[in-house]
Amino acid sequence: MTDTTRSLRDCLAPAKLNLFLHITGRRPDGYHELQSVFQLLDWGDRLHFTLRDDGKVSRKTDVPGVPEETDLIVRAASLLKAHTGTAAGVDIEIDKRLPMGAGLGGGSSDAATTLLALNRLWKLDLPRATLQSLAVKLGADVPFFVFGKNAFAEGIGEALQAVELPTRWFLVVTPRVHVPTAAIFSEKSLTRDSKPITITDFLAQQDCNTGWPDSFGRNDMQPVVTSKYAEVAKVVGWFYNLTPARMTGSGASVFAAFKSKAEAGAAQAQLPAGWDSAVAESLGEHPLFAFAS
């Protein structure tokens, strides 16, 4: 990342994985109560921010299917500007590397990186708690990325406790299908009554020797997604012939953990054509964590 008084270049918006995802209930407002552990990855979109003196917020990169006015990046910058009353503006460029509709948190991570980066570039010095309160208005996953640590999440994903996770390498495979989160949450067959657990339940069963917490939990959305999207089911099936794997979020990405980059790369080399993939190392902290106190 390059940091000058006028710009911030090459800011990572890291992907996340849900090491497990349990749906424990549904609130009167329609939102689902969740429990999950979020894992940050050293892989994601790259954002570039350049200061403007005219107060305007402008996205300089076209993102297919995402109009500028509805882009979470622009919404995050505009929200921060409105909250603080700053006269500063910004040009934002994005190198989009994460697939959309994949359960990796790409748009939410972009929004969080925007909040953190502009907190520095605009010299706002807002505390993390304030940025998180703004993040809630942008989406359920955005507060986690502003929180900036691997976390045990509850509620709709906004109640977060930092958790230490072992360093490991992940192979993330994404079939070329878009899974709409809202549609999966509305499915009648979706499990909505998983028994609540505690953070100590997860930590006690983590298998740090193998580097994969497959002894704990599941993704409650996975059976619904694999029943409706054959390509996701194929990826899950391919992985289970090799190593334990799990879908992240509402899909479509499926991941497995490995002890080393070499092991993950060897598995990646066996993938059939037509699936996108990435090998990524776990992160313990968001790269822009220091941009808020």
Curated annotation (Swiss-Prot):
The keyword Transmembrane does not apply. It holds the Pfam family GHMP_kinases_N. GO terms for molecular function: 4-(cytidine 5'-diphospho)-2-C-methyl-D-erythritol kinase activity; ATP binding. Keywords: ATP-binding, Isoprene biosynthesis, Kinase, Nucleotide-binding, Transferase. ATP binds at residues 99-109. InterPro entries: GHMP_kinase_C_dom, GHMP_kinase_C_sf, GHMP_kinase_N_dom, IspE, Ribosomal_Su5_D2-typ_SF, Ribsml_uS5_D2-typ_fold_subgr. It is an enzyme of class 2 (transferase). Pathway: Isoprenoid biosynthesis; isopentenyl diphosphate biosynthesis via DXP pathway; isopentenyl diphosphate from 1-deoxy-D-xylulose 5-phosphate: step 3/6. The active site is at 16, 141. It comes from the Bacteria. Its EC number is 2.7.1.148. One of its GO terms (biological process) is terpenoid biosynthetic process. HAMAP family: IspE. Belongs to the GHMP kinase family. IspE subfamily. NCBIfam families: ispE, PRK14608.1. Catalyzes the phosphorylation of the position 2 hydroxy group of 4-diphosphocytidyl-2C-methyl-D-erythritol. This is 4-diphosphocytidyl-2-C-methyl-D-erythritol kinase. The lineage of its organism: Bacteria, Pseudomonadati, Pseudomonadota, Betaproteobacteria, Burkholderiales. The gene is ispE.
